[in-house]
């Protein structure tokens, strides 16, 4: 485990688990909103990229209690679990909830069938990117038709 000593000073922050496509978008939004956060990432290459960009990060597996504790989960406001693996997200959700009962847990589900399991395991919010993308495309299509045509 490698991390920045300043992470130990964080409180009321968010822990972002995963720095893939979705994790990058989350980090961008947190930076814009000036929300304190730390990223947990298993990839050495992505971890180094985070450090070079000055992003607080820990190189390690978010399924590990020790890694979550080193990220300050007991002092955190919430966690955003956006790894592209439903079973890993489920495992992290269970561990995170066991370490902080008040933690806001937002997690990703690649498949709708995992959403209920994630909620039952402690997730407060479950995001299904492909489903949300479908809703957005559907709205775009509907907006190209007159309102009365939709109200059939």
Task: Identify the meaning behind each predicted range.
Residues 1-152:
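Cytosolic regulatory regions of ion transport systems
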């Amino acid at each position: 485990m490698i991390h920045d000593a300043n992470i130990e000073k964080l409180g009321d922050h968010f822990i972002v688990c995963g720095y893939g496509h979705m994790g990058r978008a989350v980090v961008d939004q947190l930076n814009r909103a000036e929300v304190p956060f730390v990223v947990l990432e298993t990839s050495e290459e992505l971890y180094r990229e985070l450090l070079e960009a000055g992003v607080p990060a820990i190189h390690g597996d978010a399924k590990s209690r020790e890694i979550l504790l080193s990220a300050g989960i007991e002092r955190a406001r919430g966690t955003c679990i956006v790894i592209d693996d439903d079973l890993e997200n489920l495992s992290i959700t269970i561990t995170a909830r066991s370490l902080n009962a008040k933690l806001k847990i937002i997690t990703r589900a690649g498949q709708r069938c995992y959403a209920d399991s994630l909620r039952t395991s402690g997730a407060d919010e479950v995001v299904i990117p492909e489903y949300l993308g479908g809703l957005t495309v559907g709205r775009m299509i509907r907006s190209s038709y007159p309102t009365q045509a939709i109200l059939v």
